[in-house]
């Protein structure tokens, strides 16, 4: 896959010169992933029994069917039952970047090579993850929303399952610091200082965005719950657009956090 556009993500050529030294800019990558459940027939009979054991215990067939549907929806959340279908990445300062997305059929000629964000179709998940891990070492730090609890462990485990080399293994280190990983879901709750019901209880990204006057990534009528449906319908670009809106909102939220709350101990 062509990765020339990846180089535009890296800002190390934007340095300031002093009287006696050169200070390189700190490179910060903001990213988000979208996941889609693997088909049920991907799992053997024993695995399916394990996955739906909770539903199969229910005596009422209607309740059992409903519970099975709920469990199928939850499969998107786990790297052993789902795959990464999109990763959107932006440089926190320049807001240039890439959106890597799985697409069976996509016309790259539609893309504007001069655009600040390049949409890069990938044939499969392995190609997508390989492209991501080629970009990752170019950055000193990352910013996510709930990345410590979801995005990072998910891509670590999917990469391991597909034997894709992981180039940054320090994103799940010491929790109570913002480098190299600033997780805004942790920062805006002060590391869950007040639990689920206190003043710093956690809200979702949509709620935080609206509270701070940022356009919600869900404003266009698409959410993460739609990814399975969009994949089945071949609407790959719609997934990529939504994932990018998530990252753009995260960048805006990060800027507000850094200016107004950064440094609170």
Where are these regions (language model features)?
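Conserved RNase H-like, two-metal-ion catalytic cores of nucleic-acid enzymes
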Residues: 21-127, 134
């Amino acid at each position: 896959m062509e990765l020339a556009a990846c180089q535009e993500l890296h800002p190390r050529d934007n340095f300031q010169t002093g009287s006696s030294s050169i200070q390189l800019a700190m490179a910060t990558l903001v990213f988000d992933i979208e996941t889609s459940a693997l088909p049920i027939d991907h799992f053997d009979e024993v695995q399916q029994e394990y996955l739906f054991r909770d539903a199969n215990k229910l005596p009422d067939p209607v309740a059992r069917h409903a519970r099975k549907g709920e469990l199928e929806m939850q499969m998107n959340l786990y790297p052993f039952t789902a795959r990464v279908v999109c990763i959107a990445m932006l440089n926190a300062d320049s807001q240039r970047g890439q959106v890597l997305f799985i697409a069976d059929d996509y016309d790259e000629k539609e893309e504007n090579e001069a655009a600040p964000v390049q949409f890069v179709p990938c044939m499969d998940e392995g190609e997508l993850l390989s492209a991501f891990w080629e970009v990752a070492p170019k950055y000193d730090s990352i910013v996510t929303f709930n990345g410590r609890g979801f995005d990072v462990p998910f891509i670590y485990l999917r990469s391991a399952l597909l034997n894709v080399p992981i180039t940054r293994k320090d994103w799940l280190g010491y929790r109570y610091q913002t480098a190299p990983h600033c997780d805004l879901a942790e920062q805006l709750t002060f590391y869950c200082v007040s639990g689920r019901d206190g003043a710093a209880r956690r809200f979702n990204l949509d709620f935080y965005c609206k509270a701070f006057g940022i356009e919600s990534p869900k404003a266009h009528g698409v959410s993460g719950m739609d990814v399975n449906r969009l994949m089945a319908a071949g609407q790959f670009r719609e997934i990529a657009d939504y994932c990018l809106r998530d990252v753009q909102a995260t960048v805006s939220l990060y800027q507000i956090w850094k200016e107004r709350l950064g440094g609170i101990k």
